Swiss-Prot record:
Residues 475-484 have a biased composition (Gly residues). Residues 71-74, 204-238 are lumenal. This is Palmitoyltransferase ZDHHC1. Interacts with STING1; ZDHHC1 constitutively interacts with STING1 and in presence of DNA viruses activates it by promoting its cGAMP-induced oligomerization and the recruitment of downstream signaling components. The gene is Zdhhc1. Residues 1-38, 341-415, 444-484 are annotated as: Disordered. PANTHER family: PALMITOYLTRANSFERASE ZDHHC1 (PTHR22883:SF8), ZINC FINGER DHHC DOMAIN CONTAINING PROTEIN (PTHR22883). The chain crosses the membrane at residues 50-70, 75-95, 183-203, 239-259. Residues 1-268 are annotated as: Mediates interaction with STING1. One of its GO terms (biological process) is positive regulation of protein localization to endosome. The keyword Transferase applies. The active site is at C161.
Length: 484
């Protein structure tokens, strides 16, 4: 099964080879071991093998029986010789490649009479382990692979050719290449002959009637002969055209397939690779593409559910940004907890199980922004507390001067001890401008400074400014007026 809950399209190995029987019951008939195939003549034949034989017969019959005899008289011997040599050579190498047993030497020495044992994955992880095949029960070479179609180890395994119905290995690889090359050359030559006949039929049909059997039919141009000169058979002109056109179409298709196959194996030989090694190297990329296609082929509803589950797992730790009202309520309810959590308000839990947070793809979240909340000027700072009175030990003039200085300065609210002061930045001491008097007492700056102060972000408690007792009173040694 794949990610879309669909069965995989990959072809699994044959059940009779790879499925281990149950330990409780004996092997069922469908789980009996498969016999090894010796070569391409072993039963059963593959459908593509039969198609290859039929195409060879069709090309040979139409080429030698219909098209070559219609060539000009002086071209006929060359046509028979060239096409005959190519077709005969292809037949020899093709039959040889089919008949050769490409199995490993140790496998060929073993008898093919009985079926091989069934592979049990509970006992072995791979068919070939430490250069020993667990199915063939022989030691094999490092380049040998076990073919599931032939059920045997092939030395220098390249691929299993369905057209030959045989494995292609070190023993028959060159024969396979010669078979492909000769087939391509023969089909190309046959397509050229068929094209010439098809064109000359409309341009100058008399050039196709040079055989002596056409001399008695000079006045009957619609009558043609096939299978000349051994067994002439009369036919009509449309039959000649249909056969030539059909051969051209099949020939072009065969040329494309054979040419592609030959170029591919030339590429493999240049890079010193086998078909099996090439497939293994490109398998990860192909599987990734197949997985992407399977995900795209999923129904939209199934894909949206899977994406929702993914985003819910991925973004479950993200807490939404609290609104301004929630932050204000949390500030008024518990200022210490609000400061400890850096201003984050825990969202309320859903009242029912039906309330789910949708993924960003369904309900997009806005980008969180830092909000600055301003307290009104009539708040904490406007509440004035009386400053502690200093000890009066001086003259009346100095007492009046001290009182005038005290009244001229704006009162500062002492919020508590110095340990209770909290700040979120290193420049917190500069957030509120403080004017120092002659006695060292603190006062707020000018009205312009108070205007700028109202635009700054404040915490739950205003910072406290303490007047040091060492400042003293007027006239004392620690006081500001005692300086010379």
């Amino acid at each position: 099964m794949n990610i879309c809950n669909k069965p995989s399209n990959k072809t699994a190995p044959e059940k009779s080879v790879w499925t281990a029987p149950s330990q409780d019951s004996g092997p069922s008939p469908e789980l009996q071991g498969q016999r090894s195939r010796r070569n391409g003549w072993s039963w059963p034949p593959h459908p593509l093998q039969i198609v290859a034989w039929l195409l060879y017969l069709f090309f040979a019959v139409i080429g030698f029986g219909v098209l070559v005899p219609l060539l000009p008289h002086h071209w006929v011997p060359a046509g028979y010789a060239c096409m005959g040599a190519i077709f005969a050579g292809h037949l020899v190498v093709h039959l040889t490649a089919v008949s050769i047993d490409p199995a490993d030497a140790n496998v060929r020495d073993k008898s093919y009479s009985g079926p091989l044992p069934i592979f049990n994955r509970s006992q072995h992880a791979h068919v070939i382990e430490d250069l020993h095949c667990n199915l063939c029960d022989v030691d094999v070479s490092a380049r040998s692979k076990h073919c599931s179609a032939c059920n045997k180890c092939v030395c220098g395994f390249d691929h299993h050719c369905k057209w030959l119905n045989n494995c292609v290995g070190e023993r028959n690889y060159r024969l396979f290449l010669h078979s492909v090359a000769s087939a391509l050359l023969g089909v190309l030559l046959l397509v050229l002959v068929a094209t010439y006949v098809f064109v000359e039929f409309f341009v100058n049909p008399m050039r196709l009637r040079t055989n002596q059997h056409f001399e008695v039919l000079k006045n009957h141009t619609d009558v043609w002969f096939v299978f000349l000169p051994a067994a002439p058979v009369e036919t009509q002109a449309p039959a000649i055209l249909a056969l030539a056109a059909l051969l051209i179409l099949l020939g072009l298709l065969s040329t494309a397939l054979l040419g592609h196959l030959l170029c591919f194996h030339i590429y493999l030989m240049w890079h010193k690779l086998t078909t099996y090694e090439y497939i293994v190297q490109h398998r990860p990329a192909q599987e990734a593409k197949e997985t992407h296609k399977e995900l795209e082929s999923c129904p939209r509803k199934v894909r949206s559910i899977q994406e929702m589950e993914f985003y819910m797992r991925t973004f479950s730790h993200v807490r939404p940004e609290p609104s301004g009202q929630a932050r204000t309520a949390a500030l008024n309810a518990n200022p210490s907890q609000f400061l400890a959590t850096q201003g984050q308000v825990e969202p309320p839990l859903p009242s029912s199980s039906d309330t789910l947070a949708l993924p960003p793809r369904i309900q997009p979240q806005k980008k969180r922004k830092r909000r600055v909340y301003r307290l009104p000027r009539s708040g904490v700072l406007d509440r004035e507390l009386p400053l502690p009175r200093l000890r009066e030990t001086g003259t009346p003039s100095r007492r009046s001067s001290s009182s005038s200085d005290s009244t001229s300065a704006s009162p500062v609210h002492a919020g508590g001890s110095a340990g209770a002061y909290y700040s979120a930045s290193a420049e917190s001491m500069e957030e509120i401008p403080v004017a120092q008097t002659r006695l060292g007492s603190a006062a707020l700056g000018a009205p312009g400074a108070r205007g700028r102060e109202s635009g700054l972000a404040l915490q739950a408690r205003s910072p406290a400014v303490f007047v040091s007792p060492s400042s003293g009173e007027p006239g004392t040694p620690g006081g500001g007026d005692g300086l010379p």
